[in-house]
A protein has these predicted regions:
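Polybasic, low-complexity binding patches
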Residues: 36-44, 54-100
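Conserved catalytic motifs of the protein kinase core domain
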Residues: 23, 44-45
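Short cysteine-rich loop/turn motifs with clustered Cys
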Residues: 1-26, 51
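Cysteine-rich micro-motifs
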Residues: 46-50
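Histidine (H) residue identity feature
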Residues: 13-14, 26-29, 53, 61, ...
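Short recognition patches in nucleic-acid-associated and regulatory proteins
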Residues: 23-36
Length: 100
């Protein structure tokens, strides 16, 4: 079975995450809940091992530092890829994750 190619603007950050789907990987939306669809549309997804997703205490769903780091990297990637400002990011995603 072929691995499905998915749109992702995130930089590869091994061993934390990949920017491509790999066998057994879990897809994680950088900005979930109300922003999940926008994350998909904008390529703000990463691919994780099950342990780094939600199958251990180190997983992004249980590790605040990891989640915050991914959000910061996601905001930087979005601003760079789309040539947009912090204000435009906040208008789309509701929050600035970068230090001023």
């Amino acid at each position: 079975m072929a691995i499905k190619k998915e749109f992702c603007i995130m930089k590869n950050n091994y061993p934390m995450w990949a920017n491509y789907r790999f066998t057994g990987s879990h897809k994680h939306h950088i900005f979930g809940a109300a922003y999940r669809k926008k994350s998909d549309e904008d390529g703000l997804v990463i691919f994780l091992t099950p342990e780094m997703h939600n199958m251990s205490n180190q997983g992004i769903h249980f590790n605040r530092w990891f989640s915050d780091y991914a959000k910061k990297e996601g905001q930087k990637a979005w601003m760079e890829y789309y040539g947009k400002s912090k204000e435009e990011f906040v208008a789309r995603y509701g929050h600035n994750y970068l230090e001023d």
